[in-house]
Amino acid sequence: MSTRSRIGILLPDDSILSVYHHFDGYPEWLGVTLEEHFNTYEKASKLIDGGNMGCCYSENEYNAETGEYETTEPRTTYYGGDDEAPILSKNFDEFTRIDCWQEYIYVFVKDRWVAYSIRQKFDENYEEIIKVIVKEVEIPKKQTVE
């Protein structure tokens, strides 16, 4: 099971360019990772320009021959392909109405990441979003073990 999320960057005209992020979308991991490794407008833009992804910062790769995960250099695992490009939303409301079963959304605003929990309610046929509940949540400070 994955904690899905959406990562966006606020553009000068208040539109948001965003991508899907599949794994570990909760603030304690994705929020901390975004703040640690993608903490400038340039880094956030480059991350989003790559399109939809499995993970923004992966240090493991599955080896099909051995059936085990191997440690690798940290990298973003993009899906690739024409259907995986970023989506441009004209405003925050439109951004919250993108349906990718996300539990959290993140927006890079000026010089920092802002995180929100999100819940979308659908009509009885699950064809249309009828209500969106968005609440800003704190991105915790990175925990270190000593």
Locate predicted features.
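Low-complexity intrinsically disordered segments
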Residues: 36-146
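Short, extreme N-terminal segment that most often corresponds to the first beta-strand
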Residues: 1-26, 30
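All-alpha amphipathic helical-bundle segments outside canonical DNA-binding/catalytic cores
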Residues: 31-35
